[in-house]
Amino acid sequence: MHLADLIETTLSGMGYELVELERAPAGLLRVYIDQPETGIAIEDCEKVSRQLTHVFTVENVDYERLEVSSPGLDRPLKKLADFVRFAGAEARVTLRLPVNGQKNFTGILREPTGAAGEEKIGLEFEGKDGPALLEFAVSDVDKARLVPVIDFKGNQRKGNKQ
C-alpha cells in the first residue's frame, strides 16, 4: 500500500483527514491533519502520532522522525472538497498556466459549479478593470492556500463551513 493511502486509511478510521504529506531530508515525515467539524488541537496531533507510529512499525515504513501538525491558518487547498468547504473564504491561487498573462490570484472562493467530474471553482478578485470572476478546475491549480484571517475577538474564520 502506498504511504499516503496507508496514512489516509488510518486517519479516516480515527475521524481525521489527511491534508498534506511531506517527506523531508534526514528521514523526517510530516503529516498535516484536519478534522472539519472541530479543527485540530495538540491532543489530536499526539493521538495521531501514536497511532501512526504503531502502524508504521507494523507496515515497516522507513522514517527517522514523525511530525504531526494542523495545516495552519494558511491551510492548503488540494481537493474539490476543500474548495467546497471553504467557499466564501479568501484564498491565494496559483494556476499551472497563465490566464491573460497572470498565474497568481487572490480573492473570494465561490461554490464549485458544473456536472460531477467537470466542476469549475469560482474566485472573485479585483481585476485591472474592477471586480472579476475567474473559473478553473482543481486540475488547473498549481498551489492554493487560504489567506490567514486572525480575529482576536474569538470568532470563526469567515466562510468556513464548520
Swiss-Prot record:
The keyword ATP-binding does not apply. Coiled coil: none annotated. Belongs to the RimP family. This is Ribosome maturation factor RimP. It comes from Cupriavidus taiwanensis (strain DSM 17343 / BCRC 17206 / CCUG 44338 / CIP 107171 / LMG 19424 / R1). One of its GO terms (cellular component) is cytosol. Required for maturation of 30S ribosomal subunits. It is found in: Cytoplasm. It holds the Pfam family RimP_N. It comes from the Bacteria. GO terms for biological process: ribosomal small subunit assembly; translation. Keywords: Cytoplasm, Ribosome biogenesis.
